[in-house]
Amino acid sequence: MRLSISKLSVVMLALPILASASVLPRTGSTGASCGSTTSGQAQCCNSTQSNTTPLPFPLSVITGLLGIDLGAITGLVGLTCNPITVLGLGGTNCNSQAVCCTGNTFNGLINLGCSPLNVAL
């Protein structure tokens, strides 16, 4: 059986495309850990504030509906946060406040029990 160069080229170009389209299940956590001393996840928050500062209008309503007592929270409250996937590697960029949040998170809208991370991202 004889393969032409064009057929061989098509096969060679198709292999990387098929390999990159393969779906593999994720295992473990999707966020970077804050270090060996805490069980929190590294987050990049648009803003952080003290638990004694009143939240802006829509967030204050949400915390009230969820029954969150901000006075009982230790640490900062992170607002509009996204997980930092890998610390120290290219592609990770946090132009706002990088924090480690050890409390509850509500889909990144509100993260509780946060402390600042002192790393260059």
From Swiss-Prot:
InterPro entries named among the record's database cross-references: Hydrophobin (IPR001338)
Disulphide linkage map: C34-C100, C44-C94, C45-C81, C101-C114
Residues in the signal sequence: 1-21
Pfam family, one: Hydrophobin
Cellular component GO terms held in the UniProt record: extracellular region; fungal-type cell wall
Keywords recorded for this protein, A-Z: Cell wall, Disulfide bond, Glycoprotein, Secreted, Signal
Keyword Secreted (UniProt): yes
Alphabetized GO MF terms: structural constituent of cell wall
Residues the record marks as carrying a glycan: N46
Induction: Expression is negatively regulated by the basidioma development repressor lfc1. Expression is positively regulated by the cross-pathway control WD-repeat protein 2 (CPC2). A CT-rich motif, which is often found immediately upstream of the transcription start point of highly expressed filamentous fungal genes, is present at the expected position. One additional CT-rich region is also found upstream of the TATA box in the promoter region.
Statement: the UniProt record of this protein carries the keyword Glycoprotein: yes
Protein location: Secreted; Secreted, Cell wall
Organism superkingdom: Eukaryota
Predominant subcellular localization, coarse grouping: secreted
Record's function text: Aerial growth, conidiation, and dispersal of filamentous fungi in the environment rely upon a capability of their secreting small amphipathic proteins called hydrophobins (HPBs) with low sequence identity. Class I can self-assemble into an outermost layer of rodlet bundles on aerial cell surfaces, conferring cellular hydrophobicity that supports fungal growth, development and dispersal; whereas Class II form highly ordered films at water-air interfaces through intermolecular interactions but contribute nothing to the rodlet structure.
Sequence similarity: Belongs to the fungal hydrophobin family.
Name this protein carries in UniProt: Class I hydrophobin 1
Gene: Hyd-1
